[in-house]
From Swiss-Prot:
EC number of the protein: 1.5.1.3
Protein name: Dihydrofolate reductase
Gene Ontology CC annotations of this record: cytoplasm; mitochondrion
Native species: Saccharomyces cerevisiae (strain ATCC 204508 / S288c) (Baker's yeast)
Chain's gene name: DFR1
Binding site for substrate: E34, M35, K36, Y37, F38, R39, R74
């Protein structure tokens, strides 16, 4: 990416088929293998001299238990209209506060391009809705309950129509190539998909690229 912009990647787990991403500000599931995937994908890089930035809204930041934040080995960028400044960097804690998504990305591009491999956007719903025009890729974990009668309630959704209009799902080989080599993927299933079953859910790791 020498001379180019830092790739922007949306990463999210979605309940199928409506692409539900949350309920009452949280998630109705706790899937350790999915959380491990998220941690590895966003922490690891192909270039050992670079790191990744995570952009999130204030509510997403506050939903992370205090003992786990900032998320380690990543630049944590929190955006909120309540912040006065365009960009405030706490270098010691690797935390940035910005008053808008546009200002956050502009400053990351201007000041950290040589040090960042990717910018991951991790939520919440309002932030996801703003990034379809600027995102290069989406990493979507597609989640299905094993018992269709036990489908959890959702009140926040990814815009599935916009996703399908602008992005196309890639095959599993392209997902593997896209990820840093140390990310641990499950064995592929009979359809050559990267899928797992855990705690009453089946979930599949997928990559979408801009058309």
């Amino acid at each position: 990416m020498a001379g180019g912009k830092i790739p922007i990647v949306g990463i999210v787990a979605c309940l199928q088929p409506e692409m539900g991403i949350g309920f009452r500000g949280g998630l109705p599931w706790r899937l350790p293998s999915e959380m491990k995937y998220f941690r590895q994908v966003t922490s690891l890089t192909k270039d050992p001299n670079k790191k990744n930035a995570l952009i999130m809204g204030r509510k997403t930041w506050e939903s992370i238990p205090p003992k786990f934040r900032p998320l380690p080995n990543r630049m944590n960028v929190i955006i909120s209209r309540s912040f006065k400044d365009d960009f405030v960097h706490d270098k010691e804690r690797s935390i940035v506060q910005s008053n808008s998504l546009a200002n956050a990305i502009m400053n990351l591009e201007s000041n950290f391009k040589e040090h960042l491999e990717r910018i991951y956007v991790i939520g919440g719903g309002e932030v996801y809705s703003q990034i379809f025009s600027i995102t290069d890729h989406w990493l979507i974990t597609k989640i299905n309950p094993l018992d269709k009668n036990a489908t959890p309630a959702m009140d926040t959704f990814l815009d599935a129509k916009k996703l399908e209009e602008v992005f196309s799902e890639q095959d599993p080989a392209q997902l593997k190539e896209f990820l840093p080599p140390k990310v641990e993927l499950p064995e592929t299933d009979c359809d050559q998909r990267y899928s797992l079953e855990e705690k009453g859910y089946c979930f599949e790791f997928t990559l979408y690229n801009r058309k």
